[in-house]
Regions:
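Flavin-dependent oxidoreductase catalytic cores
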Residues: 1-450
Length: 450
């Protein structure tokens, strides 16, 4: 992963005014509010009450059991999230099949694992009730990792929709590459059935909602950007597989579970190999026309909750046209976060009835809460979503709700050591600086000794 240059010293910013002035001087006009009370407001979602507007993003710990069931570390993590006060918990990606795992320790949902996954939900809800007196709204993200798939030995086993010169040479999370298999009609049909059956099992486990994952570099997202492969069942319309899954869940599960999506607003990969980009070959510039159209189609089908992301929020959808993750130039992530939040604002403004969760606030450290509140007040999004912040600071929501704001000495340091554990160490991940008892020994063993 590219080296990050952290241009701003948030520890030297003593107020929201300092934050706005310093970042605003660089053209980064984040929405901000000193009043965080909007984050505590409950709201209605699919007929249920979500206790507040603070959400935890789906972030894998790479720490499931080889069987695909949750481990003790997963139980620990979600108990901490739930007792930490967030109103919406978006459970990390669970693969619909063994061949759809991005790593050998990713959870898999099937008849053998659903019982333990259900216990995870029940115990986490109990932890939330005991700590906060509320039940969080629980979303499960289902996935097939596609070109990011790896087998039990961490060897890449990529399944792609089409050739992509910007992505074909780095299919695994560590930058390595495997022999790419191009998906057939029959394979996509198998994946569609896997998502539908996964939703059935998610309902059995007790989730409120299931996320049909359409983001990052995974298989359903790639179907949206498959402009170069028209002559097959899923080439036109490119949304066919997504809507076959949604319609199949409705038929199979009915009202037993709601449906949402986590969706790339744009891909940071040029046309004709990227989604949400200007349709000029090799041009790195976003065009939100298709994402807006898709979001409206989703809302019309009753899929109202949409969580917008991109390949990675730190990267801007501008530049040389190469996947920024894989060249050597260091980046500053703040403009990428600003671009993504603006795209969320623009898509939400053109999608009546949609409920949008934002991405990228962890990069703003203790001011993430102020931007979350400002974004909700100003109509940029409806739910303030935090990802790696929850690894480092699982009770961030509780501190906000209790009037303390976000405590800088508990915040994510955006040091990327959690990524190092995955990419270099091929091991379980979490916050090395803030959760040292568990993760510092792993970091020393699997990263520093390599």
């Amino acid at each position: 992963m590219k080296k990050v240059e952290k241009k701003y010293r948030f520890g030297q910013m003593h107020s929201v005014e300092d934050f706005s002035r310093i970042l605003g001087a660089d053209g980064l006009d984040f929405p901000v509010s000193q009043d965080l009370s909007v984050l505590a407001q409950p709201f209605e979602l699919y007929g249920k009450t979500v206790p507040n507007r603070l959400g935890i993003q789906p972030l894998e710990g790479f720490d499931g059991l080889p069987s695909g069931a949750p481990s003790d570390l997963i139980f620990r993590r979600y108990h901490r999230y739930a007792s930490g006060g967030a109103g919406l918990i978006w459970y990390e990606s669970i693969a619909i099949s063994d061949d759809g795992r991005c790593n050998p320790l990713q959870m898999v949902i099937n008849e053998e694992t659903v019982g333990e996954i259900g216990r995870l939900i029940r115990e986490s809800d109990q932890a939330a009730w005991e700590s906060m007196g509320h039940k969080p709204y629980n979303v499960l993200q289902l996935t097939h990792s596609g070109r990011r798939s790896n087998n039990k030995n961490w060897e890449p086993t990529p399944l792609a929709v089409c050739e992509n010169p910007y992505m074909d040479d780095h299919t695994s999370i560590d930058g390595s590459c495997g022999k790419i298999e191009i998906a057939t009609d029959e394979k996509i049909e198998e994946i569609i059935e896997g998502f539908i059956h996964g939703a059935e099992l998610a309902a059995e486990a007790g989730f409120d909602c299931v996320d049909v994952k359409v983001c990052h570099e995974y298989i359903l997202r790639e179907l949206l950007s498959a402009f170069t492969r028209r002559q097959w069942r899923y080439g036109h319309p490119r949304t066919r597989a997504l809507f076959d899954i949604i319609d199949g869940i409705r038929r199979r599960v009915g009202g037993g579970i709601e449906i949402c999506v986590r969706l790339n607003a744009y891909d940071c990969v040029p046309y004709p190999y990227g989604w949400g980009m200007v349709k000029k070959e090799g041009v790195m510039e976003p065009d939100l026309t298709e994402p807006v159209k898709l979001c409206n189609m989703l809302v019309e089908r009753g899929v109202k909750l949409i969580n917008l992301s991109t390949m990675m929020p730190r990267y801007r959808p501008y530049g040389t046209g190469l996947m920024a993750e894989h060249d050597d130039q260091p980046i500053t992530p703040y403009a990428g976060v600003h671009d993504l939040l603006k795209a969320t604002r623009d898509i939400k403004a053109q999608t009546p009835g949609g409920i949008f969760m934002c991405t990228g606030l962890t990069w703003l450290e203790q001011f993430g809460a102020n931007v979350g509140a400002g974004g909700i007040e100003q109509g940029w999004f409806d739910i303030a979503g935090f990802g790696r912040q929850a690894f480092a600071y699982p009770d961030f929501a509780k501190d906000i709700l209790c009037g303390k704001g976000m405590q800088r000495n508990k915040c994510c340091l955006t040091c990327d050591k959690c990524y190092d554990l995955i990419q270099i160490g091929h091991t379980t991940t979490g916050c090395v600086p803030r959760d040292q008892e568990v993760y510092l020994p792993l970091y020393r063993k699997y990263v520093q000794k390599k």
